Amino acid sequence: MRQILIAVALAVLVSTAGCAAFGGGGDAEPATSDGGVVEANDPAADATGVNQTVRLSADESVAGSEWTSLSVAYPRENFTVESAQHGNVSLGVDTDDDGEVDERYDESHVSGVNNNAYSFTVELDTGYELSAGDVVVVEYPAVNNPAEPGNYTVTATLNDEQTTNGTVVVE
């Protein structure tokens, strides 16, 4: 229930942010994943340039370390990940797990945005020390949905240490 509340709160935050970081995009209802790991602002099959918001709760394996990267891998035969400029990637940390981003970072904190046809990695220099329970939030603006509706497993990795699977629903 708590994860559903967090996902709903994030959807409201994203849709009302306007021009601020984590801005909304369109009228589509976000597609949530199990565990709230990945949300797509447009769940339609064949949608292009879809904003994907990744929310990953830090665990003990990364607690005490600086937030240095987040990677997301999609099924290579289904999704296409395009490149994104540093300034188009939104970054933040929800430090108290209330669904709202408390710490925000801009393109000056991004040391690299790398992608291939099915994944992306955002490399960071935030100076932010992760605590267990912190929820890192990254919005990546350039994912193309598959042509076939379905549930697709996505893997998100925080600091090359913590890996979590989620499901993106394409309608």
Task: Show the residue positions of the predicted features.
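Serine/threonine-enriched low-complexity regions used as flexible
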Residues: 144-164
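Low-complexity, serine/threonine/proline/glycine-rich extracellular segments that form mucin-like
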Residues: 33-95
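Short, conserved beta-strand segments of beta-strand-rich sandwich/propeller modules, principally
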Residues: 11, 137, 151-153
